[in-house]
Amino acid sequence: MDLLATGRIRGTFGIEGFVKVESFSGEYEHFLGFDRVFLSILKEKLREQKYKDGWFEIEEVNLRKADALVKFKGIDNPEAAKCLTGSELFIPRDKAAPLDEGEVYVHDLCNCNLVCEGTLVGKITSVAEGGGGYLLEIAGKTSEAAAESSFYVPFNKEFIGKIDLKAKTVELMHRWILE
């Protein structure tokens, strides 16, 4: 099953075990169609109990302006809900929010090659949240003389050009950002 990261649990809400979920796409309507999700981070206490496989059934979803409140079956108090904070929610790709022209799922950028002027710069290993937006974590070299390392490139139209998911390439527009 092809899973796609769709959001992250930011914290707890109330006394009944609800969690606040931030959508990676900024869209929340599709959360209403979820009956279960896979959570990426499980605290050992929960892993030892009934959630060994990582799948959680959803009891209720309430949409708000900047997040969604989600209630999972069996998570009935703030202490249990707190154990889920930081987890990413994964869903089957066919349940994800539809993309508009030119949009990509951030998760799909991982393992793409970052190229600048036809030269391989490195491989995108993850996507992190920064204060001004997403940052692509790259494993590669910032110059010919540099040792291989990890570095970050802002994921915005000023620095990122063509994205070809079939070819697994992302174009870096300006080499000077690596200096």
UniProtKB/Swiss-Prot annotation:
Top-level taxon of origin: Bacteria
SUPFAM superfamilies given in the database record: PRC-barrel domain (SSF50346), Translation proteins (SSF50447)
Transmembrane segment boundaries: none
Keywords in alphabetical order: Chaperone, Cytoplasm, Ribosome biogenesis, rRNA processing
GO biological process, one term: rRNA processing
InterPro entries on file: PRC_barrel-like_sf, PRC_RimM, RimM, RimM_N, RimM_N_sf, Transl_B-barrel_sf
Matches recorded under Pfam families: PRC_RimM (PF24986), RimM (PF01782)
Record's subcellular location: Cytoplasm
One GO location term (cellular component): ribosome
UniProt domain PRC barrel: residue ranges: 101-179
Gene Ontology molecular function: ribosome binding
Stretches assigned to coiled coil: none
Domain observations: The PRC barrel domain binds ribosomal protein uS19.
Function: An accessory protein needed during the final step in the assembly of 30S ribosomal subunit, possibly for assembly of the head region. Essential for efficient processing of 16S rRNA. May be needed both before and after RbfA during the maturation of 16S rRNA. It has affinity for free ribosomal 30S subunits but not for 70S ribosomes.
Subunit record text: Binds ribosomal protein uS19.
Membership in a protein family: Belongs to the RimM family.
Name this protein carries in UniProt: Ribosome maturation factor RimM
